[in-house]
Structure formats: C-alpha cells, structure tokens
Amino acid sequence: MASSNRGNARPLKSFLHELYLKHYPEVGDVVHLLNTIGVDCDLPPSHPLLTAQRGLFLARVLQAVQQHKLLEDTIVPKILKKLAYFLELLSYYSPKDEQRDIAEVLDHLKTNRDLGLDDRLWALIRKLRQDRHHASVNVLMPGSDYTAVSLQYYDGISIGMRKVIADVCRSGYASMPSMTATHNLSHQLLMASGPSEEPCAWRGFFNQVLLWTVALCKFRRCIYYNYIQGSIATISQLLHLEIKALCSWIISQDGMRLFQHSRPLLTLWESVAANQEVTDAITLPDCAEYIDLLKHTKHVLENCSAMQYK
C-alpha cells in the first residue's frame, strides 16, 4: 500500500509513554500530535488507515486518563501520609519553638485530615522560612497560583532546580502532573537539597513539606472542580469523530469488499454503527474494546494494497 506513517511514530509513542507523568494531558498537545499523523506519507487525511491510526492514538490517551480518574480517591490520603512523614522529620531537626508550631499542624492533620490544612501549612511554611531568612520575599498567596508562590520559599536549591519544579508543577487547569511525576520530583528535590547532615537535613525536609503542600492544594482543586472530566469529555468527542468516520467507510461498499475475508471484524463494526452514541464520554471498558478493535482494523488496512482501496 501507499507509504505508511512511520516517520512521526516516535513522537506519538513518546507522548503515550510519558502519559503516566500527567494526571491528564493538555488537550492542545493531543490535538497537535493528532494532526501530525499522516504528514510524512502520501495518503489523504481521510484515508481509513490514517483514521484508524488517529482513533487508536486517541483511545490509548483516553484509556490512560480514565485510569488516572479511577485513582483520584486515593490521592489526597497518600499526600497526607507524605506530609505527616516529612513534618515529623522536619520537627526532629528543628529547635523547640519550631517543634511546637509543627506539632500544632500535625495535630490538625491527625484530627481534621485535610480540612483547613492548607492554610495551616502555608502559615507554617511562611513562618519557618522567615524565621531563618528575615529578608525573604513577603508576598501573600494569590488565589491558586501555588507553584509560583512556592518558588520563593524553597530553601538552598539552584535556579535550575527551581525551573524543574516550575515545569513539572505548571499552574492552571489545562494539564496536571500525576502522582508519579510528583514522587519523581520529590526524590529529585531531596537530592538537590544537600546531604543528610544538619542543617541540610532541615532544609531538605522543609522543601519536601513545601512540595507536598503544593501537591495537596493543586490536587484538591483539580478533584473538587473535576478538571479531569473536561479532558475525558474532549478526548471522547475526538475519538467519536474518528470512529464515526471509520465506521462509515467500513460499512460502505469499498469497506465491505475489503473486509469480506475478516467477517468477525466487519460484524463488530456493524455493531458499532448500530450503537454509535456521540454525546457521552467513553468509559474505560469501552475504551479498551475500541483499542482492540482499532488495532485489528489497522493491521488489516496496513496489509492491503493501494488498489484495494479503489
């Protein structure tokens, strides 16, 4: 058949491989990659093979985001455990007056969990930072730009590390780092904060409390406003469009002729055509089924000669 889309496969695979670092991706990035499918081959954008490739890419992205959605109930409890752990370590390396302040926050965490915890954490961070660095920037926290605010409080890290933090923890609702990305950043930040001896140990654990405070604020906001559902809905709609286009071609005369020796696959597409619903978000089980269907369909299309599309 006509030349395939091997040239731009690597960016697609790289994006899919790195999806575990995003709680949900920026839809603009998904659309950009979607539009690169087929640019390096001589097939028209409406060709069924390219439609199948776009559909398969979207289905895989959607599957990853849906899986992250299922984990949302576990995120805040995990962050609270991290905060309790690092607050206790920070207290161990702190003087008596700071230990009292930290103990109050720990007591609040144990009795009230995350209710009102973010305000107490920011107050503690601000006090500890200013007690040790009297010339610290004195800026009130503006709304939800937690990442920008946190960058003025990190202690003893390089400009390069601050840039890494800013890149991973980008503010806004267009995308969101995953818990895996936050764990990776936590380890990187701990290594960048210096050796484990005092006073570097205090600095390292202070920076960890700050990072997980930012994570708590960002994830609580993300979950409360259900930002991930917007990503799921948009990607679902894009996938519906590709499936609808591919379905129309497969049940046409040309498609029927090409798939005449793949009757089980054709039957599945006829079922999709009969039950096509383009308004609802695609569920995780349906997404897995679409991936299997699109993979088999793509395989058939890749092994057809160009003449068979005529």
Swiss-Prot record:
It comes from the Viruses. Pfam families: Herpes_BBRF1 (PF04793). Keywords: Early protein, Transcription, Transcription regulation. Coiled coil: none annotated. Signal peptide: none annotated. GO terms for biological process: release from viral latency. Transmembrane segments: none annotated. Enhances the ability of BRLF1 to induce lytic infection by cooperating with it to transcriptionally activate the BZLF1 promoter. Belongs to the lymphocryptovirus BBRF1 family. This is Transcriptional activator BRRF1. It comes from Epstein-Barr virus (strain B95-8) (HHV-4).
